[in-house]
Amino acid sequence: MRKLLPLLSVLVLVLSACGTAEEEETTESQEGEVEEITLEVATLIPPMTEILELAQSELEEDGINLDIVVLGDNVQPNDALHNEEVDANFFQHVPFMEEYNLNNDGELTPIESIYFANYGVYADEYEQMEDIPEGATIAIANDISNIDRSLQLLEQHGVIELEETDERYYTQTHIAENPNDYNFEEVDLLMLARMYDDADAVVMTPAYAEPLGLTPAADGLITEGTENEFAITLVAREDNADSEPIQKLKEAMTSDEVRQFLEDNYSETAIPAF
C-alpha cells in the first residue's frame, strides 16, 4: 500500500498538469479570437460609397464589420450621426459640418480629409465664362456653406467681387461688384443637376456633374482646385472620434489602395487630400 501512494501522487500531478495545459490552450484560443465590431457609416453617392467599399475588406482583418448606410439627401447623414444612429458619416466638407453643429447644438468633428471634389461652373450653351451674357441666371446651392463656396469660386476667377466681412460665411449680401448683373438662384444641392437645362449656368460638384456626362477638366468653365477648406471628409462625434474602430477606418480610407483608386478612376473629379 505504501508503494502505491507515490504512484498515485505522480498520477495526480500528471493529470493536473494536463488539465492546466488544456485550460491555458483554451484561454489562449479565446484571447486570440478578435471580437467583431460593427461600424455604421452614412454616405450618399460614388465615389464616397466606393471608397468605403475599399475600406471594408481591410477592416475585416481587424474584426470590424463596416456597414455602409446609403441615404437619400444631404440632411439625413448628419442627423443620423448626431442622434447616434450611425457611428460616422462621409459625404461633406468641414464648413457644412460646422454649420450643422451651429444650428443643431451638435458635436460632430472631422476625422480626416479624403478628397477634393473639384467644384466648377457648367453651362449647356456656353464654352467660356466670358460668353455668359449680362443678366444671366446662375444656379448655386442654397445651404449657407455652399453659398459661401460658390461665391468664393466666382470671386477667385474675377466674376464678382466680395466685400470684406467678419462673418463666418459669405452670402449674396456681401457681393460688392457684379459687373455682369448675374442673378444667383439658390436651389437645393440635390437639384443642381436638374438646373443645368433651366439656368444659364450651374455651380456644382463633380458628383452631380458626372451623371450629365460632365467633368471639371473637359467641361468646367472655371474650377476651384485644391487650395481650400472644402475637402470631402470623414466625420464622427466628439465622443467616439478617438475610438479604435474610427481610427482604423481613417487608416483604411487613406491607404495607398484608395489613393490609387482615385487616381485611376476619378483623376479629374476627386483629388486625394491625404
Predicted regions: what they are:
Residues 19-22:
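Bacterial signal peptide processing site
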Residues 82-92, 136, 159, 180-183, ...:
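Alpha-to-beta junction loops
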Residues 13-17:
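C-terminal motif of bacterial Sec signal peptides marking the signal peptidase cleavage site
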Residues 118-130, 231-243:
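A bilobed periplasmic-binding-protein/Venus flytrap-type ligand-binding module shared by bacterial periplasmic
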Residues 68-79, 167-194:
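Short helix-initiation/N-cap motifs at beta->coil->alpha
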Residues 148-155, 253-273:
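Periplasmic-binding protein-like
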Residues 99-111, 126, 198, 203, ...:
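Ligand-binding "clamshell"
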Residues 34-46, 64-70, 137-138:
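Short, well-ordered beta-strand elements
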